[in-house]
């Protein structure tokens, strides 16, 4: 994302932005918090950190267990230690949906400076930068990585002005919305195709499909597959 030049700037910028990105410690940007749920939040406010939505099917053993949950407020970030091909050391996820609660296994950090929520949604989750940061402030276990919060807060990151954050955040969020819209269109087309297949082909034991194009009225003929195919034998020399 950043150029290889000595100047701390990205290769692509919006017009009007020329100053260097500022070197900051994460401790200048975030503070670690541990705000426990006092039952102000119930089951319907449990957030899936991995997918960032309220879990409609969430279950807990009893109401008292909800007191172990951490409050996760809008704009805060949580560390998810699951390793994957995309995130070698786990990742940070920003809360962009609203206040709620998450399991106590997730460490939560609150922003302490003015920021653009959408810029940080993508920047704090950007593996080429954050992967290097997390490689130095996490400890590996068999399935997950554990964050060492004090080491994370000492790490350095380059940060643009708030105005540039907003421009970048708007662009990336707009692209995300467009991708989501196209995914929905694709899903709808797949459903339509599935429905058409059921109507364009006859059901088992029948010779007429439910839907036909104008001018086609004859029954479909019963034929053996051998009438349409030739067997090809492939020999491999030992």
Role assignments for model-derived ranges:
Residues 1, 26, 139-142, 156, ...:
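Basic chromatin DNA-binding modules
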Residues 1-22, 155, 161-221:
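Amphipathic alpha-helical segments with low aromatic content
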Residues 6-10, 100-105, 139-163:
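A short glycine-rich beta-alpha junction/loop motif
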Residues 13-36, 212-236:
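Non-catalytic DNA-recognition/assembly elements of restriction-modification systems
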Residues 27-64, 100, 226-229, 237-238:
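DNA target-recognition patches
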Residues 30, 64, 73-74, 109, ...:
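C-terminal accessory/regulatory regions appended to core domains
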Residues 49, 57, 61, 68-130, ...:
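A short beta-sheet element
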């Amino acid at each position: 994302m950043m150029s290889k030049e000595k100047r701390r700037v990205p290769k692509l910028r919006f017009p009007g932005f020329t100053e260097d990105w500022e070197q900051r410690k994460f401790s200048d940007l975030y503070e670690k918090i541990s705000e426990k749920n006092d039952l102000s939040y119930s089951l319907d406010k449990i957030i899936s950190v991995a997918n960032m939505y309220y879990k409609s099917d969430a279950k807990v053993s009893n109401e008292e267990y909800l007191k172990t949950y951490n409050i996760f407020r809008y704009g805060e970030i949580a560390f998810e230690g699951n390793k994957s091909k995309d995130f070698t050391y786990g990742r940070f996820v920003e809360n962009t949906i609203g206040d709620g609660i998450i399991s106590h296994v997730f460490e939560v950090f609150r922003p302490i400076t003015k920021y653009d929520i959408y810029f940080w949604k993508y920047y704090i989750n950007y593996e080429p930068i954050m992967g290097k940061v997390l490689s130095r402030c996490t400890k590996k276990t068999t399935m997950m990585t554990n964050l060492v919060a004090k080491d994370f807060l000492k790490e350095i990151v380059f940060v643009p002005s708030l105005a540039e954050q907003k421009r970048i955040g708007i662009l990336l969020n707009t692209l995300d919305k467009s991708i989501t819209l196209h995914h929905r269109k694709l899903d709808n087309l797949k459903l339509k195709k599935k429905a058409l297949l059921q109507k364009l082909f006859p059901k088992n034991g029948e010779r007429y499909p439910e839907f036909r194009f104008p001018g086609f009225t004859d029954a479909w003929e019963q034929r053996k597959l051998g009438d349409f195919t030739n067997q090809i034998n492939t020999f491999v020399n030992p």
